[in-house]
Amino acid sequence: MSYFPWLTVIVVLPISAGSSIFFVPYRGNKNKVIRWYTICICLLEILLTTYAFCYHFQSDDPLIQLEEAYKWIHIFDFHWRPGIDGLSIGPILLTGFITTLATLAARPVTRDSRLFHFLMLAMYSGQVGSFSSRDLLLFFLMWELELIPVYLLLSMWGGKKRMYSATKFILYTAGGSIFLLMGVSGMGLYGSNEPTLNFETLANQSYPLGLEIIFYFGFLIAYAVKSPIIPLHTWLPDTHGEAHYSTCMLLAGILLKMGAYGLVRINMELLPHAHSIFSPWLVIVGAIQIIYAASTSFGQRNFKKRIAYSSVSHMGFTLIGIGSITDTGLNGAILQIISHGFIGAALFFLAGTSYDRIRLVYLDEMGGIAIPMPKIFTMFSSFSMASLALPGMSGFVAELVVFFGIITSSKYLLMPKIVISFVMAIGMILTPIYSLSMLRRMFYGYKLFNVPDFYFLDSGPRELFVSICIFLPVVGIGIYPDFVLSLSVDRVEAILSNYFHK
């Protein structure tokens, strides 16, 4: 057993080191010094995380590990209580990987670069803190910590309509946070003279069914905004349409996954009876979301908004996996979270680098881009294939596991399972339609651009490096998905056996 506070260091390091970014001395190119300082912090964080997980984490142990507990607020029983298990280790590693690459991708940012990189590191701490929290108050504070950086990144470095998008984002997420705070307060104050928000204590707490449903619904609204789940998704296309692509990488790769993680970590683990009641509705909403978002994506002229709606559609598979209440379905949902974290981040990165070169976002104005930009065309096509679940890539395995999870669920009758499976199949057909249509309208044809030197228009070493770094795990998970599933399978079995299979 390790007594070193690994998780505290991992959570606090990015924002602490980011705070000193305003005092970093530099000579010559200020932006280059700040960018590489931030990248070094991210790399150090990844090394510490990898070391702690490799040498102090037992993957076959479903219990909470590396847990720490420090008295935080003495009046109440509130603690700084981080801890990890098989559910949280994957998202934490994903956070470090995507944040590092997003920092590397942010080289074109030159205005207020100190503040920009500090906000990215602050988001890093907030996201890792959310995934490693074992106290509801700590979870809520970390959940809120990453909202303000996103708002500032969007409002200061976004597009022409950035203020509208930033305001819409903060109104939606702040509204969801009110419901989250109400749920946290209600669970902490219920049935005890001394309030407690410890996950382990709350897991053994029983509530009247009506009250448990109220708690569940409050948390669900907060997660529905963040994930997003229809009809609370409308902030996402506007945000992705205006945000800088490094911010989009963090949104699509990490922030959207926090809602699904919270749905499993809090709603499934702490409110099992309410989840059993709500799970059919999650499956229904997930099925509708797959079709609705895929159909809406096909009608988008803005190619960044088209990718954003594809993220909403893929979230539907995660909802179905969570609602299936099976080992297979829940493991598939977790795999989909990791898989789409890579794929979504890569697509927005390539969309941003394409926009930097041609300064066009509407598909009907594009065409023939494959001729001057063959490298970007190749990478964009590869990740589009991953998004439409091409066999051999991570998206295919994740959707297939979710599919098997719902058809093997003992909770649902045969006819509902057939209908849901049919809807999922339609979604799998619609995804290639909007993905391949986007590729055709962007890259094929004979339009010519007034660019004096096509060589400089194509992808450079930075774009190739970032794309390859993301593509390798996409293919690796597609070929050997047990690399991810082995982390979560024991914890998933423990959750379902403790709460649903008694």
Curated annotation (Swiss-Prot):
Top EC class, one word: translocase
Protein EC: 7.1.1.-
A Gene Ontology BP annotation from the UniProt entry: ATP synthesis coupled electron transport
Compartments, as annotated in UniProt: Plastid, Chloroplast thylakoid membrane
Membrane-spanning parts: 4-24, 37-57, 86-106, 113-131, 136-156, 169-189, 210-230, 244-264, 274-294, 307-327, 332-352, 388-408, 418-438, 464-484
UniProtKB keywords: Chloroplast, Membrane, NAD, NADP, Plastid, Plastoquinone, Quinone, Thylakoid, Translocase, Transmembrane, Transmembrane helix
Record's GO cellular component terms: chloroplast thylakoid membrane
InterPro entries named in the record: NADH_Q_OxRdtase_chain4, NADH_Q_OxRdtase_chainM/4, NADH_UbQ_OxRdtase, ND/Mrp_TM
GO molecular function, one term: ubiquinone binding
Membrane topology: Multi-pass membrane protein
Catalytic activity annotation: a plastoquinone + NADH + (n+1) H(+)(in) = a plastoquinol + NAD(+) + n H(+)(out); a plastoquinone + NADPH + (n+1) H(+)(in) = a plastoquinol + NADP(+) + n H(+)(out)
Domain of life, source organism: Eukaryota
Family in the record: Belongs to the complex I subunit 4 family.
Record-given protein name: NAD(P)H-quinone oxidoreductase chain 4, chloroplastic
